[in-house]
C-alpha cells in the first residue's frame, strides 16, 4: 500500500485555525466544570489527532450543524436541526453480524469513552454539488470489523439505520418515497480502507442529532449519501446489498457513488461544487471538484480496471 499523504484542503475550504482552537479550549473548560454528560446535547470526547488528520480547520460549526440532509427528519436543509430535538440517541446498541466468526454487540456509550477515537479532518462532497470540510471524531471501521473476524466468503458490508417514526417525523412523510429503514453498503475492501470511519462526533463533541447521532459512516471519497446515519446494524454479506438511493433512482445514484467530476448527475454537472460557509464579493464560492474528492492516491487502486462511468 502506498504511503498515506493527507490531501491538503484548498484555501477556500478552511476557516482560521485560531477560531477552532478557541472553540476546543472552551469545550475543554466546560468538561472540567462537569458541564456535559453522556446524554447532554453535546458531550466532550477524549480524542486525539489520527494519522490521517491535517493541521487545518473546517467549515464553521454553525454551517456543519444547520445545513444537512437527513430525510428521517424532513426534506429541507434546516429540518434536521429543528425536527430532531426529541430524538434519543442513547442508550444505543450496534450489532455486527452476518458472515463473521465473532458477532459483535456494542454498547455505544462504551464506544464514546474509547481511547481509540481519532480526529479526522475530511472533505465532504454532497451529490448535490456542494461541499464542506468537517472535523470528524471516530474509530476506523476496520477496527470494529476485524473484531468481528470476517468470514473468508464475505465480500460486502450492509448498513441499516433505525426506524422511529415517533421521533423521526420524516419517516411518516409518504412524499419522500423512501422505504425505511435507510440502508447503505460498501464492498468489504472499501469498508476496510484506512480512510473509512465510524464517526461518533464532530469538533471534539458527540454527534448532534441532526448530524447522525449517535454514530454514522464517513467515506470521504464518496458522495455524502453513502454516509448512513444513526446506524443500528452492520452485516457482512457475500453479495452486493441494496441501497436506499440506488433502489429509488438507479440511473441517478449508483452503488459506488465515488466522487467523479467527469460523470455528471443526469440533472446537473459534477465538475464544480459550491463551498458551504465560504463567501466572496460575487456570492457563493465555487471550486473544481477533485477526482475521488482528493483522495485518489489512497483509494484509486480499489477501482483499477473498472469503468467508472458504468460503475458510478
From Swiss-Prot:
GO BP: any one term: protein repair
Post-translational events: Predicted to be exported by the Tat system. The position of the signal peptide cleavage has not been experimentally proven.
SUPFAM superfamilies per the UniProt record, alphabetical: Oxidoreductase molybdopterin-binding domain
Record-listed E.C. numbers: 1.8.5.-
Major localization class: periplasm
GO cellular component: periplasmic space
Coiled-coil region(s): none
Keywords: Metal-binding, Molybdenum, Oxidoreductase, Periplasm, Signal
Catalysed reactions, semicolon-separated: L-methionyl-[protein] + a quinone + H2O = L-methionyl-(S)-S-oxide-[protein] + a quinol; L-methionyl-[protein] + a quinone + H2O = L-methionyl-(R)-S-oxide-[protein] + a quinol
Binding site for Mo-molybdopterin: 68, 71-72, 126, 161, 211, 216, 227-229
Keyword Signal annotated: yes
Keyword Metal-binding attached: yes
Gene3D superfamilies, A to Z: Oxidoreductase, molybdopterin-binding domain
Highest taxon of the lineage: Bacteria
Reported cofactor(s): Mo-molybdopterin
First and last residue of the signal peptide: 1-42
Cell compartment(s), UniProt: Periplasm
Binding note for cofactor: Binds 1 Mo-molybdopterin (Mo-MPT) cofactor per subunit.
Function text: Part of the MsrPQ system that repairs oxidized periplasmic proteins containing methionine sulfoxide residues (Met-O), using respiratory chain electrons. Thus protects these proteins from oxidative-stress damage caused by reactive species of oxygen and chlorine generated by the host defense mechanisms. MsrPQ is essential for the maintenance of envelope integrity under bleach stress, rescuing a wide series of structurally unrelated periplasmic proteins from methionine oxidation.
NCBIfam families: PRK05363.1 (NF003767)
Subunit-level organization: Heterodimer of a catalytic subunit (MsrP) and a heme-binding subunit (MsrQ).
HAMAP family: MsrP (MF_01206)
Similarity comment: family membership: Belongs to the MsrP family.
Annotated protein name in UniProt: Protein-methionine-sulfoxide reductase catalytic subunit MsrP
Organism lineage: Bacteria, Pseudomonadati, Pseudomonadota, Alphaproteobacteria, Acetobacterales
